[in-house]
Amino acid sequence: MVAEIFNHDICENNVVISPRSETAQDNEGLFGRIGTLETRLARNEREIDAAQSVRYRVFVEEMKARLPAEAMRRKRDFDAWDSVCDHLLVLDKSIEGDSEDQIVGTYRLLRQETALANNGFYSASEFDIAGLVARHPGKRFMELGRSCVLPEYRTKRTVELLWQGNWAYAVKHRMDAMIGCASFPGVQPEAHALALSFLHHNCLAKGEWEAVALPELYHEMDLVPVEALNTRKALNAMPPLIKGYMRLGAMFGSGAVVDHAFNTTDVLVVLPVSSIAGRYISYYGGEAERING
């Protein structure tokens, strides 16, 4: 399940500024900076705990998710995958306090080799990921998940930094494909008939990239005949994050899954790096390679 974050079109004059020459600790693992915002991976357990607090504020307090009792008591969104994932952060350095107080956005990143050595991919609890990965023995997958940004930071620059970090991470670890669950609000797929049908008819992952919702969780996405689809209305009904993935060149798995705990209807994003639109590679790729050497 992924919270919807503000999407944007790339603007040529909005440049991601590379890290300034400050202290070695400040710049350790830094993927990029725009103004007072910067992106990097969490460096310690305190920062991961703070990211879990941000997730709780978005998923529970805002989106009305129902987490296990211990998570609700601690006011943290956490699960078994947190201990093996890398946690991408966006921090606002203008906020006074420690780094934990400055976290305003986060993404959870899981590499294939780490997933296979531990709990598998989170999205495999909803979709047949094993079959997808097995058809690509020479490719390396990474999972994106638990994306969220605090309401007051849902701006172009915050999302640019999150994608800057995602791309830099993918380049650093030589990833070939990105996967992950993206969400529609609510637990009634029929309420999103236009958008789900558009994904089914226009962006369905097929052939070697096919991935299907688990049989016991499968909900049909083909709810409106292709000849009856109004493209404009379908796109207007699409959550921003999903439209963002579409612009990058993503495909989507077959079937939606209702996640009652998070009060969402999930679809599977399948994004081969080779399919990412060229202008995005140019925009994010050059900067990522330059920062990471």
Curated annotation (Swiss-Prot):
GO terms for biological process: lipid metabolic process. Its EC number is 2.3.2.30. The keyword Lipid metabolism applies. It catalyses: a (3R)-hydroxyacyl-[ACP] + L-ornithine = a lyso-ornithine lipid + holo-[ACP] + H(+). It holds the Pfam family Acetyltransf_5. Pathway: Lipid metabolism. GO terms for molecular function: ornithine-acyl [acyl carrier protein] N-acyltransferase activity. Disruption phenotype: Deletion mutant is unable to produce ornithine lipids. Mutant promotes earlier tumor formation on the plant host. It is an enzyme of class 2 (transferase). Keywords: Acyltransferase, Lipid biosynthesis, Lipid metabolism, Transferase. It comes from the Bacteria. Catalyzes the first step in the biosynthesis of ornithine lipids, which are phosphorus-free membrane lipids. Catalyzes the 3-hydroxyacyl-acyl carrier protein-dependent acylation of ornithine to form lyso-ornithine lipid (LOL). Belongs to the acetyltransferase family. OlsB subfamily. This is L-ornithine N(alpha)-acyltransferase. The lineage of its organism: Bacteria, Pseudomonadati, Pseudomonadota, Alphaproteobacteria, Hyphomicrobiales. The gene is olsB.
